[in-house]
Amino acid sequence: MESWTWMTVVVLLGLTVRWTVSLNSYSGAGKPPMFGDYEAQRHWQEITLNLPVKQWYFNSSDNNLQYWGLDYPPLTAYHSLLCAYVAKFINPDWVALHTSRGYESQAHKLFMRTTVLAADLLIYIPAVLLYCYSLKEISPKRKIASALCILLYPGLILIDYGHFQYNSVSLGFALWGVLGVSCDWDLLGSLAFCLALNYKQMELYHSLPFFCFLLGKCFKKGLRGKGSALFIRIACTVVASFLLCWLPFLTEREHALQVVRRLFPVDRGLFEDKVANIWCSLNVFLKIKDILPRHIQIAISFCFTFLSLLPACIKLTVQPSAKGFRFTLVSCALSFFLFSFQVHEKSILLVSLPVCLVLTEIPFMSTWFLLVSTFSMLPLLLKDQLLLPSVVTVMAFLIACSTFFPMFENTSEEQLQLKSFAVSVRRHLPGFTFLPRIIQCLFLSSVITMILLTILSVTLDPPQKLPDLFSVLICFVSCVNFVFFLVYFNIVIMWDSKNGRNRKKID
């Protein structure tokens, strides 16, 4: 069969899994008065359709910001408005001001699920296919396998089609941006990433690698020649993109500031709910939120985030390469997730996207990370009654990855991209030849722990005095895994001596 035929089969399989998951429950189903993210997305459609633009982000009698107030950038609001027009055409009751609050029906659920699928088909899935086809030095079969594994990644499917969100939009735009700048379509790549950033502010997790990669390109071209011209063109593209997205909100200074305040609610504290990052895990032993003033918490969070991502960003600026860019995206996004302020459990998807992009380069570690990332959201998925689809999609993903990228056949020092690091260590410890075995043991320990915690969470009730015991354990175990991955990816980046050979010549 032609590769395009196989790719069509892959897409159809991915769509089938997505739609099957969408038949299950969603966030806040039948749980008044606040319901959940499903109601939040519906409510934003109600607000954007019935209120003028200037009232979208302000508290009023018609727009109670305490009830799922709009807190995403303008592009999300425009998307909500577009969906609202379609909803009003089908059934005005779905988006009627005030009276539609908490609206639930099978017809409305079908509509909402369809809007997610449409966004996926228009933005995310085409980007995945084009990215896989653009991969160099791998066979067509491996490109198809890569597309299959990426489209079967359970974390994104369960959150968008189960819990209910539109993460595929921002992640899709970000992937188009990665494609653009990796193929030297720098202006298109910059535009795509600006769209991602104006859809979800959490795309800031990816912003520094984009900036450093493009800046490094400008340096390589020479700031006195083509480099300065490229820098100016990119800057103009970014400014123009933001102006177009924010234009309705720039008529008054207070209006723009209110949008910014809604996007970055520092008053909420270091973290919300149970999230697998450093601050939530540390909170088990040391109540940082109670001990330190909020401005000190923000300062500490900023310092740790900045210091953890600085080495990779410096190397990417000095040695810009498509490979280095992909790995730095992983490292920086993971640094933000572990150390930054106001992290949500679903933000791990921002790390998972670039990990999917290096799946063909380090299949063992990528598959392991993607499994842990899905496991880290288990408390949320159980809350939404998504246990069965979680187990099935994880198994399907694991089978696909194990079939096309055999797990333990990809754990040599070369395949883990740790050869340079191991050689450096052996200069001081000649007997250091067991690194692959260590990695395999850590993987098995991680998987066994995840399976045990999943079984315990489902079969046992936590002690009355410790109602969040299993959720905290899941977050803590996931955090330990993520710290290990952060160290691993930084080692790969800093000890990579192949950038010069892998880097395309920048004229």
UniProtKB/Swiss-Prot annotation:
Enzyme class, UniProt record, top EC level: transferase
GO cellular component, one term: endoplasmic reticulum membrane
UniProt catalytic activity: an alpha-D-Man-(1->2)-alpha-D-Man-(1->2)-alpha-D-Man-(1->3)-[alpha-D-Man-(1->2)-alpha-D-Man-(1->3)-[alpha-D-Man-(1->2)-alpha-D-Man-(1->6)]-alpha-D-Man-(1->6)]-beta-D-Man-(1->4)-beta-D-GlcNAc-(1->4)-alpha-D-GlcNAc-diphospho-di-trans,poly-cis-dolichol + a di-trans,poly-cis-dolichyl beta-D-glucosyl phosphate = an alpha-D-Glc-(1->3)-alpha-D-Man-(1->2)-alpha-D-Man-(1->2)-alpha-D-Man-(1->3)-[alpha-D-Man-(1->2)-alpha-D-Man-(1->3)-[alpha-D-Man-(1->2)-alpha-D-Man-(1->6)]-alpha-D-Man-(1->6)]-beta-D-Man-(1->4)-beta-D-GlcNAc-(1->4)-alpha-D-GlcNAc-diphospho-di-trans,poly-cis-dolichol + a di-trans,poly-cis-dolichyl phosphate + H(+)
Highest taxon listed in the record's lineage: Eukaryota
Residue intervals annotated with topology Lumenal: 24-114, 165-172, 251-297, 354-361, 407-437, 490-507
Residue ranges that the UniProt entry lists as topological domain Cytoplasmic: 1-2, 136-143, 194-229, 319-332, 383-385, 459-468
Main location as per UniProt: endoplasmic reticulum
Transferase is among the record's keywords: yes
Keyword Glycoprotein: yes
Biochemical pathway: Protein modification; protein glycosylation
Assigned keywords, A-Z: Endoplasmic reticulum, Glycoprotein, Glycosyltransferase, Membrane, Transferase, Transmembrane, Transmembrane helix
Membrane topology: Multi-pass membrane protein
One GO biological process term: dolichol-linked oligosaccharide biosynthetic process
Record-linked Pfam families: Alg6_Alg8
Chain ranges passing through the membrane: 3-23, 115-135, 144-164, 173-193, 230-250, 298-318, 333-353, 362-382, 386-406, 438-458, 469-489
EC number: 2.4.1.267
GO molecular function, one term: glucosyltransferase activity
Glycosylation sites recorded in the entry for this protein: N59
Places the protein is found: Endoplasmic reticulum membrane
Function, in words: Dolichyl pyrophosphate Man9GlcNAc2 alpha-1,3-glucosyltransferase that operates in the biosynthetic pathway of dolichol-linked oligosaccharides, the glycan precursors employed in protein asparagine (N)-glycosylation. The assembly of dolichol-linked oligosaccharides begins on the cytosolic side of the endoplasmic reticulum membrane and finishes in its lumen. The sequential addition of sugars to dolichol pyrophosphate produces dolichol-linked oligosaccharides containing fourteen sugars, including two GlcNAcs, nine mannoses and three glucoses.
Protein family according to the UniProt entry: Belongs to the ALG6/ALG8 glucosyltransferase family.
Protein name: Dolichyl pyrophosphate Man9GlcNAc2 alpha-1,3-glucosyltransferase
